[in-house]
Amino acid sequence: MRHYEIVFIVHPDQSEQVPAMIERYRANIAARGGNVHRLEDWGRRQMAYPIQKVHKAHYVLMNIECDQETLEELEHGFKFNDAVLRHLTIKRDAAVTAASPMMKEEKARDLLQGAKADAPAEQPAAA
């Protein structure tokens, strides 16, 4: 079986359906003997350019291991699902399980915001 990296963009009005979509794709891959090595829900983000007059969308990244038939079925599902605005599939040499740069950046930003919130507010000196 081969390794693939898939990113798909979901219409923002359909964001509530993303967990169900992910679970459906996971079940489809597992039923055919494949494996999901990494799954990252990047959430709602600003797009570089509008697609169908939409400026924000919900992004999802999956690194999977599957056969060609399973991949074709996934891509067929993306193509005919109106909620999926775009998708990209890249063949990888090996399974990727480390966090993506996007998630590393988000974690660092969250840690910084958490540190600022935990820091005590400076008290003015009483004279």
Curated annotation (Swiss-Prot):
Protein name (record): Small ribosomal subunit protein bS6
Q: Gene3D superfamilies, alphabetically?
A: 3.30.70.60
Q: Which NCBIfam families does the entry mention?
A: S6
**Gene Ontology CC annotations of this record:** cytosolic small ribosomal subunit
In which organism is this protein found? Thiobacillus denitrificans (strain ATCC 25259 / T1)
GO molecular function of the protein, one example? structural constituent of ribosome
One Pfam short name: Ribosomal_S6
In terms of InterPro entries, this protein maps to: Ribosomal_bS6, Ribosomal_bS6_sf, Ribosomal_S6_plastid/chlpt, Transl_elong_EF1B/ribsomal_bS6
